[in-house]
């Protein structure tokens, strides 16, 4: 049986409060749809931790700039429902709102063609939706993906805050593939006193090691093979650390050479402390190596945690 689908925020809030009145705990798995095994593993974890689970399916315009791939983001809602039906047992509902930004009334549409001083905007502002409030986690959002996608993390933090306020979950689950995002949500929850447990789940990978992503479907067969250079170079870096090679500049150069040698275009390679996301020069304790690279028109991210005590 396919899960119940809730389309508006008031009905979603009413459902959640009804569950709470019955003493049930609620899990939340935020997604943008086109579900793959990584998403489904989060749902399974949530079902193991809570009584009922809400899977949100909403492609968030607030985390895309007007030049990014909002319009081409893959979608298969009926397929998503079929996948969820196979594991829900009646304990999963889908929150699939049409729009979480338009609250009636519109702001003047922003067109950043030079008329607003080069201000960076998202598809929400560019579309003229009546929304002006954004959540920012100032320090953690500045590096990595925040450099090349300057509206991304404020859009993520804002939509997750909206979902927390609407669904009112006890637990929310996020994949560690989006490592910076996971740490940002953790910090936001701590700083704003949300009474929600944030669970990070290990990266789900294809059999050949490619990190699962909804965007993988847009890779050609050749691009997909070349994209394996990301996960393979990360594994090589981890093996090098185990052999005592701890200079971060050398490790980053090795990864860059592997990706570029496979015709990838590197956005960044960073080696940072797992907790603070501050860069390190020598690996002496727990770090994460984060990579973003383009293959064709598809931007992929991946990372690997390295836990050492040297």
UniProtKB/Swiss-Prot annotation:
Gene3D superfamilies: HUPs (3.40.50.620), Pantoate-beta-alanine ligase, C-terminal domain (3.30.1300.10). One of its GO terms (biological process) is pantothenate biosynthetic process. ATP binds at residues 32-39, 175-178, 212-215. (R)-pantoate binds at residues 63, 181. GO terms for molecular function: ATP binding; pantoate-beta-alanine ligase activity; protein homodimerization activity. This is Pantoate--beta-alanine ligase. It catalyses: (R)-pantoate + beta-alanine + ATP = (R)-pantothenate + AMP + diphosphate + H(+). Its main location: cytoplasm. Catalyzes the condensation of pantoate with beta-alanine to form pantothenate. Essential for panthotenate biosynthesis. It comes from Arabidopsis thaliana (Mouse-ear cress).
């Amino acid at each position: 049986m396919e899960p119940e689908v809730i389309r508006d925020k008031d009905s979603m809030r009413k459902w959640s409060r009804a569950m709470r009145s019955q003493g049930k705990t609620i899990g939340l798995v935020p997604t943008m749809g086109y579900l793959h095994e990584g998403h489904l593993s989060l749902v399974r974890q949530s079902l193991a931790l809570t009584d009922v689970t809400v899977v949100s399916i909403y492609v968030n315009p607030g985390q895309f700039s007007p030049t990014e791939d909002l319009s081409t983001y893959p979608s298969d809602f009926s397929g998503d429902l079929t996948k969820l039906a196979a594991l829900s047992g009646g304990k999963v509902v889908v929150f699939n709102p049409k729009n979480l930004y338009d609250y009636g009334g519109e702001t003047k549409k922003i067109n950043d063609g030079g008329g607003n001083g080069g201000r960076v905007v998202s598809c929400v502002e560019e579309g003229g939706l009546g929304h002006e409030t954004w959540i920012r986690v100032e320090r953690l959002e500045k590096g990595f993906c925040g450099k090349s996608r300057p509206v991304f993390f404020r859009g993520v933090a804002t939509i997750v805050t909206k979902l927390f306020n609407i669904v009112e979950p006890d637990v929310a689950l996020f994949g560690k593939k989006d490592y910076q995002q996971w740490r940002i949500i953790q910090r936001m929850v701590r700083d704003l006193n949300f009474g929600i447990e944030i669970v990070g789940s290990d990266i789900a990978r294809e059999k050949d090691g490619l990190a699962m992503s909804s965007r993988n479907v847009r890779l050609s067969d050749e691009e997909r093979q070349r994209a394996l250079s990301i996960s393979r170079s990360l594994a090589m870096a981890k093996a090098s650390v185990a052999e005592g090679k701890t200079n971060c500049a050398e490790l980053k150069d090795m990864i860059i050479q592997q990706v570029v040698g496979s015709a990838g275009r590197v956005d960044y390679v960073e080696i940072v402390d797992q907790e603070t996301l501050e860069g390190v020069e020598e690996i002496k304790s727990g770090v994460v190596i984060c990579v973003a690279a383009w293959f064709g028109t598809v931007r992929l991210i991946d990372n690997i945690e390295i836990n050492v005590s040297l």
